[in-house]
Amino acid sequence: MNLKIINICTFGYDRFVDAEMEDKNKIIVHFMEYDEYIDNDKKSERKFVGSIIKGKLRIDLVTGSYIKNGELMFEQPHRHSSHIIATVEVKRIVDEFSLYAKTNICDDEILVEFESKVKYGINDSIYVVGSLEFDIIS
């Protein structure tokens, strides 16, 4: 997946990016830039407004979840924050802490990683609260 950076907030190695997907929908993602530490609101020299970044989405740091019947949805209620609330459909179980899910964010299945053990089944519709992460592919 390719994302175009619309806005970028930096803090140390952390990057919070308002991005435009190829279908022109907008999302906010978090990723780490280990090759560039930035403090005091300096500008990144590696990633900046207009840059295209390539990678994979995942929902991480899920601290709350439960089975919820309903349509696929997501919202990111906080400005410049990767915080996400979503209803997703379980497609593959990885282990007690992770699964792949169908979302309405994109066509690809997204890895969802939980902070505690969960027991969901294939095709369960679940509500999750976490962080929308972007794993950059070099």
Can you describe what each PLM-predicted range is?
Residues 1-14, 74-96, 125-128:
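Structural detector for short beta-strands of small beta-barrel domains
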Residues 81-119:
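Glycine- and charge-enriched low-complexity intrinsically disordered segments
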Residues 56-84, 130-138:
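OB-fold/S1-family single-stranded nucleic acid-binding modules
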Residues 48, 66-69, 78, 113, ...:
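A structural signal for the main folded, soluble domain(s) of proteins
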Residues 11-13, 47, 60-69, 92-93, ...:
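Single-stranded nucleic-acid-binding OB-fold domains
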Residues 24-46, 104-122, 128-134:
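Beta-strand/loop nucleic-acid-binding surfaces
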Residues 17-69:
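Acidic (E/D-rich), amphipathic helical modules within compact regulatory domains
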